[in-house]
């Protein structure tokens, strides 16, 4: 099965699983999905992530969602740059999500990082998504 936008697929799977109260999300793995999930883990939005090998030399990403008092920690998860319209921002134009309460995940020349880390590193890049 061909997937047009694997990042959007990752975000929708996380959002849907959180909406129905599932503990884990399993999906096909890729380097960019693992990097985005690692940023979410580092920022405290998910509990854990695991990459496991499956048959036919494929790998599967399992994300353990985080809940606080029965509600998902991730309230908003929105794709910003999309396959039909890429959104690039310079280091001075990086967005602040909810006045700094959320994060924007940025793909830079130095890897995938949050908007705050990109500002600190002095790099801009493609704004992948917003998380709050």
Curated annotation (Swiss-Prot):
One of its GO terms (molecular function) is rRNA binding. The keyword Transport does not apply. GO terms for biological process: translation. Keywords: Ribonucleoprotein, Ribosomal protein, RNA-binding, rRNA-binding. Pfam families: Ribosomal_S8 (PF00410). It comes from the Bacteria. GO terms for cellular component: ribonucleoprotein complex; ribosome. The keyword Ribosomal protein applies. Part of the 30S ribosomal subunit. Contacts proteins S5 and S12. HAMAP family: Ribosomal_uS8_B. Belongs to the universal ribosomal protein uS8 family. One of the primary rRNA binding proteins, it binds directly to 16S rRNA central domain where it helps coordinate assembly of the platform of the 30S subunit. This is Small ribosomal subunit protein uS8. The lineage of its organism: Bacteria, Pseudomonadati, Pseudomonadota, Gammaproteobacteria, Lysobacterales.
């Amino acid at each position: 099965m061909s997937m047009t936008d694997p990042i959007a697929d990752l975000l929708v799977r996380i959002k849907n699983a959180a909406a129905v109260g599932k503990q884990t999300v399993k999906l096909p793995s890729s380097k960019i999905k693992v990097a985005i999930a690692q940023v979410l883990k580092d920022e405290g939005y998910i509990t854990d992530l695991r990459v496991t090998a499956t048959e036919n030399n494929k790998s599967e990403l399992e994300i353990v969602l985080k809940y606080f008092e029965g509600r998902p920690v991730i309230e908003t998860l929105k794709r910003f740059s999309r396959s039909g319209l890429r959104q690039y921002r310079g280091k001075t134009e990086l967005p602040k999500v909810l006045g700094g309460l959320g994060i924007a995940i940025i793909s830079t020349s130095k890897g995938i990082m949050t908007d705050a880390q990109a500002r600190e590193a002095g790099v801009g890049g493609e704004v992948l998504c917003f998380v709050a």
